[in-house]
C-alpha cells in the first residue's frame, strides 16, 4: 500500500461572539483562496456550495498536483494532511491554502510536529526536508528489491530500485520524484480497471482487464491483485488473468472480440505498441481490430 506517513496541519475557525464557531467555508469559498484549487474526489465538476465537513476531500490544482492533499473540517478546525513524500506542487498549494486560512481566521497553524506557524511563517516551511525524509523510506524497497505503489491524484505509480536510483542520482531528488509522479498522472489514456471473478464452483478466482480498440490504455504488464483486492481475497490466490478485447466501441456497437491469456497477449504485443510508464504499468497505443486479431492469432498459437 502506497502510504508512508504524513504531516497534519490544523487551523481553528473564527469563534462567534456568543460562543461556538463561525460557519465553515464552502468548497467554493475554499477553492477561491488558491488559484485553480479543486477537489479530485468530488462528484461535481465545479466546487459546490456545500460547507466543508468531516468528509475528506483530496484538494489540488490540475497539472500542478501529483498526490493532492487531504482537507476536511472537524470540531471547529480546518485540517490539512500532506502525504510523505509529496510532490513539490502538492506542498506549495497546501502551504498557500494554510496561509490563506490562517489569515482569514486570524488563527495560528498548528502542525503535528508540535510547531506553530503564522500565515507568513508557513510559507517558509521546509517541505523539501519532508519530501527527502519520505524518499529515504523508498531506499528500503531498493534493498528488498520490491515494487512500491504511491498513490496519485489520477493513478498510482509503481516505483522499483531502478527508479529509486534515478531519483537519488538527480541534482534535486524532490523535483525528480515530482516529475516522475506527474508524468503518469496526466497521461491522456484510459486506466483499465481490474475485475476479479470466481468460477461457478467458487474454487478458482480469475482476474480480467479489458482493452478496447483504438483506445490508448494503461495496463499492468504482469498483473497481480491490487492491495484492495488482496485484502478481500485473504489467502486465496488469483489462478489466471485474462484480457478481454472489445471492438466496435466507436460506433456504439461494442462487442467482445475475444479473450486471451493475459501474459500471452503481452508477450505478442509488438514492442512499438507499448511503453512502460513506471515499474509495473505500460501504456498500450491504440490498436485496430485487425491488429488485435493478428496479436490474438500469435498469442493463441
Label every model-predicted segment.
Residues 111-131:
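Short, highly charged C-terminal tails/helix-capping segments
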Residues 90-115:
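Acidic, low-complexity cytosolic segments
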